[in-house]
């Protein structure tokens, strides 16, 4: 089913199920003998959502890479582990630069407010659908987990007036901020909402602020991309999952985040899927690996150096 303006979802279906899939991949990566990331909260969060395949993948009963490769997504666990590490390093660099305010947009099952070693005085805001925020904070509280920063969850849809909700939660636009938009700028918002999101981030960012994001679309317009999307949709459906890959994304021209930020005076650095995998110390992507949907996604880190 195609996405519509104002549609809704939860962590067991549609866009929400992709967040659960990514968390299952982080859990699988954490279980490896030589893990590049450690996310002890990924498995219990996935288990609480209750999608059988991802629960078994998170616990090690099922090889998620094997399942995903059969659907056309090779090296899924490496992909999301390397992505998580890339963004973890972004926060480490922001901390080293003296930033003490963070905003994570569309946080999903991201547990960074709980798992990263934030310095004293760090304020971490995270924004997502109210039901997602409530589910995650309640589940982690039941596990006895506590945030490692001054944590401010903000439950609101990114298509709504989230800047006002963020300010109401205590966000200070006069302080440099480290912004993270992980897994949201890949077609899950309408093109106009993507641009509006960037405009809002720019407006709320003091000099010295930083942003990290991935961007592109997991569902291209080419016949090959459409065929792969259909293959993945049918494969996930065979596993009892509601993830219509073509229907998850909005059509239209999506914003090149790096170019947009540069046009507004931000200094940017870009990377691709292969760069992240190599930086993580993992095996280089083969030609076959580069046929994965992940290879269509770009990555950017940016710094606001002037008003």
Curated annotation (Swiss-Prot):
It is an enzyme of class 2 (transferase). Its EC number is 2.1.1.-. Pfam families: LCM. The keyword Methyltransferase applies. One of its GO terms (molecular function) is methyltransferase activity. It comes from the Bacteria. S-adenosyl-L-methionine binds at residues 128, 157-158. Keywords: Methyltransferase, S-adenosyl-L-methionine, Transferase. InterPro entries: Ppm1/Ppm2/Tcmp (IPR007213), SAM-dependent_MTases_sf (IPR029063), SAM_mthyl_Trfase_ML2640-like (IPR011610). The keyword Calcium does not apply. GO terms for biological process: methylation. Belongs to the UPF0677 family. Exhibits S-adenosyl-L-methionine-dependent methyltransferase activity. This is Putative S-adenosyl-L-methionine-dependent methyltransferase MUL_4430. It comes from Mycobacterium ulcerans (strain Agy99).
């Amino acid at each position: 089913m195609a996405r519509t303006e104002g549609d809704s979802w939860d962590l067991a279906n549609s866009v929400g199920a992709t967040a659960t899939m990514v968390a299952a991949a982080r859990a699988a990566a954490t279980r490896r003998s030589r893990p590049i990331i450690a996310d002890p909260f990924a498995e219990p969060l996935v288990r609480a959502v209750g999608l059988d395949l991802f629960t078994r993948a998170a616990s090690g009963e099922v090889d998620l890479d094997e399942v995903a490769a059969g659907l056309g997504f090779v090296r899924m666990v490496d992909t999301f582990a390397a992505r998580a590490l890339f963004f973890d390093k972004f926060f480490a660099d922001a901390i080293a630069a003296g930033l003490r305010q963070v905003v994570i947009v569309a946080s999903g099952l991201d547990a960074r407010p709980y798992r990263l070693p934030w310095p004293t005085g760090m304020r971490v805001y995270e924004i997502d659908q109210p039901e997602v925020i409530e589910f995650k904070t309640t589940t982690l509280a039941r596990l006895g987990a506590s945030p490692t920063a001054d944590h401010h969850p903000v439950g609101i849809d990114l298509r709504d007036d989230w800047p006002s909700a963020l300010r109401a939660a205590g966000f200070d636009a006069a302080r440099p901020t480290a912004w993270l938009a992980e897994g949201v700028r890949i077609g899950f918002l309408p093109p106009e909402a993507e641009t509006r999101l960037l405009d809002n981030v720019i407006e709320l960012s003091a000099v010295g602020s930083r942003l990290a994001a991935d961007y592109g679309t997991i569902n291209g317009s080419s016949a090959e991309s459409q065929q792969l999307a259909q293959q993945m949709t049918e494969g996930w459906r065979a596993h009892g999952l509601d993830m219509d890959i073509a229907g998850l994304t909005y059509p239209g021209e999506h914003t090149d985040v790096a170019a947009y930020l540069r046009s507004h005076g931000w200094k940017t650095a870009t990377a691709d899927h292969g760069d992240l995998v190599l930086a993580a110390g993992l095996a280089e992507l083969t030609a076959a690996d580069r046929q994965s949907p992940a290879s269509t996604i770009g990555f950017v880190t940016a710094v606001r150096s002037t008003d």
